[in-house]
Every structure is written in structure tokens, then in C-alpha cells.
């Protein structure tokens, strides 16, 4: 299956980077190469782009799309490791970093990846297929209390307790092996009147995907490491697709902009923690009405940008 992915907030993200033609940039989520291609267009032969992705299918597709460009380095890794990645490449500082945290259209559309609740497939959901933990492992091996907490905290699912109980009851009969089986369990757990607003499995699938790929833990560390690797005036641009991610980015940016931990009663700062960034987007940038109509998957996207000081 061809790797297809429509880059969300493409123009806005590229503009936010304030690209220098001889600069060094990092695309932490290479995907199909949409954002990377626009960055490369603006770079001179002295400029450089590092494209990171944990999905080998994404890297293969990006290499084909970007075959006319020689100043890109491909890295099969997780952007959680951005610090060690740059160290291995002997790159100290960079001028801009982007993260597009959405699941690609390809990953959603290829049934075998198990990300979609619309198609029956083996329970997988691994961004990196070389990792051991899959959705199957979470659903069939986690204790009921663990499942409840994951669905509640990562999916913000109202019926997390009931869904977790139904999953555990069902798997005592036989292992739950497919997305279709899981969807049916969720449908039975959620009262019919609450199934009218969107697909009933949406929040549960989001929660399991986040757990399998450790997405929220990765994001916190990656933001800190990315800021530390930026040159003065370098930009960090992050696109999120759900409230949990957006909240993490918002809070982390605020911490880095105003890190002082002194009590409000202190007349001057004595903790010595200095601001590292300036937030560019006081409110997140959202897709235009036109983009939302063209690409329905862009509807929940939010772009937040900061500048290293």
C-alpha cells in the first residue's frame, strides 16, 4: 500500500520556523515527507535537514518523495532520542525543529496496522513494529485497574471502568485478537444513548495507542531536549491532535518561558531559573475552514510555536 499522508497546517508550520537558507533543521516526525519537502525547498546546498521517524514505511516513502534532495539525513529512531541522535551526527545546535504528532493517513488506512476502529485487523497499533508491546499485549495482559486508568487518563473516556471490566470478562473466554472484537466489546459497554456523538471506540483506541507508543512520556522529554538543542532564536513548532497532547505542550512551554519557582511574596527571583524560550503562539494556530473541509483529519489540529532566547 502506498504511504499517503496529507500534511496538516503545512504553510503555517513552515512559516513558523522562520527558515534560514543555510540553517540546520529537524523534522521529528518525517511521515510522508510533506513538511520536510517544504523545508528543503527553502534551504541552500549548505543547509541541512534531519528527518526522524520510527516507522520504516514512512522513511521508505519519504526517501522516494525527497529523492531529488541530497542535504537530508534519514534516521530510523524515535524523536524521544533527539538529543542522542544529534550527538551521534556530531550536530550541536539546530535552527528549527518540528513535531507533527498525528497518526499518518497511511497508518490509519492500512488495516493491518490496527490503528483504525473502522476496519477489522489484528490488534497492533505500534508506530515502530520492532517494539515488543502491542495493543494485543495491553488488552490481553494488563490488569483491569491498569486498563481503567489508561482509558480514563489517556482517552478521557466516561465509561472507562465499565469498558475495562467488559474487556477482562471477555478475554477470560478467549484472547481478544482483533480491532473488530474490541469495538464490539466497547459498543456493549457504552449505553446506546451515549453512542450518538462520534464513534464509541474513538477514545478507547486513542488511549491504547498512546499507551503502546508511550506518546505522552516521550513528548515531555522531547520538548525539553529539543529546546536545549536550539540555537538562539531557533524555533520549535509542534502540531497536536488531541487535548492531552496540546495540554502537555502548553504547560511545558509555559514552564520553559517562566521557570521561576520562587514564592510570589519574594520581591526578586532567588531560584536562579532563567527563561529559555519565548512563546510565539499565545493561542494555538488552527487549520482554516477550507483546510478542515478538504482534510477532515485536520479538524482537531493545533500548532504551538516557541522561540529560543
From Swiss-Prot:
S-adenosyl-L-methionine binds at residues 33-35, 53, 79, 100, 107. It is found in: Cytoplasm. It comes from the Bacteria. It is an enzyme of class 2 (transferase). It catalyses: cytidine(1402) in 16S rRNA + S-adenosyl-L-methionine = N(4)-methylcytidine(1402) in 16S rRNA + S-adenosyl-L-homocysteine + H(+). Its main location: cytoplasm. Keywords: Cytoplasm, Methyltransferase, rRNA processing, S-adenosyl-L-methionine, Transferase. Its EC number is 2.1.1.199. GO terms for biological process: rRNA base methylation. One of its GO terms (molecular function) is rRNA (cytosine-N4-)-methyltransferase activity. One of its GO terms (cellular component) is cytoplasm. Specifically methylates the N4 position of cytidine in position 1402 (C1402) of 16S rRNA. Belongs to the methyltransferase superfamily. RsmH family. NCBIfam families: 16S rRNA (cytosine(1402)-N(4))-methyltransferase RsmH. This is Ribosomal RNA small subunit methyltransferase H. It comes from Clostridium botulinum (strain Okra / Type B1). The lineage of its organism: Bacteria, Bacillati, Bacillota, Clostridia, Eubacteriales. The gene is rsmH.
Amino acid at each position: 500500500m502506498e504511504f499517503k499522508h496529507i500534511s496538516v497546517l503545512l504553510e503555517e508550520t513552515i512559516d513558523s520556523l522562520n527558515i534560514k537558507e543555510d540553517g540546520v533543521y529537524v523534522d521529528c516526525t518525517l511521515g510522508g515527507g510533506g513538511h520536510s519537502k517544504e523545508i528543503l525547498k527553502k534551504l541552500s546546498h549548505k543547509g541541512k535537514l534531519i528527518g526522524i521517524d520510527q516507522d520504516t514505511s514512512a522513511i521508505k516513502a519519504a526517501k522516494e518523495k525527497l529523492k531529488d534532495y541530497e542535504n537530508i539525513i534519514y534516521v530510523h529512531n524515535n524523536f524521544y532520542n533527539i538529543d542522542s541522535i544529534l550527538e551521534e551526527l556530531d550536530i550541536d545546535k539546530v535552527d528549527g525543529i518540528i513535531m507533527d504528532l498525528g497518526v499518518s493517513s497511511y497508518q490509519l488506512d492500512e488495516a493491518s496496522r490496527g490503528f483504525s476502529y473502522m476496519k477489522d485487523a489484528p490488534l497492533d497499533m505500534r508506530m515502530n513494529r520492532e517494539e515488543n508491546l502491542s495493543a494485543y499485549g495491553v488488552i490481553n495482559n494488563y490488569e483491569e485497574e491498569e486498563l481503567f486508568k489508561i482509558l480514563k487518563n489517556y482517552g478521557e473516556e466516561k465509561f472507562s471502568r465499565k469498558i475495562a471490566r467488559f474487556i477482562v470478562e471477555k478475554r477470560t473466554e478467549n484472547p481478544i485478537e482483533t480491532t473488530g472484537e474490541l469495538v464490539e466489546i466497547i459498543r456493549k459497554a457504552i449505553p446506546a444513548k451515549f453512542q450518538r456523538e462520534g464513534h464509541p471506540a474513538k477514545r478507547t483506541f486513542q488511549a491504547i495507542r498512546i499507551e503502546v507508543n508511550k506518546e505522552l512520556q516521550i513528548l515531555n522529554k522531547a520538548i525539553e531536549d529539543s529546546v536545549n538543542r536550539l540555537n538562539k532564536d531557533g524555533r520549535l513548532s509542534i502540531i497536536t491532535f488531541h487535548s492531552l497532547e496540546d495540554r502537555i505542550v502548553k504547560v511545558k512551554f509555559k514552564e520553559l518561558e517562566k521557570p521561576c519557582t520562587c514564592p510570589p511574596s519574594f520581591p526578586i527571583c532567588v531560584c536562579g531559573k532563567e527563561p529559555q524560550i519565548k512563546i510565539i503562539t499565545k493561542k494555538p494556530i488552527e487549520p482554516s475552514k477550507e483546510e478542515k473541509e478538504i482534510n477532515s483529519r485536520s479538524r482537531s489540529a493545533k500548532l504551538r510555536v516557541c522561540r529560543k532566547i
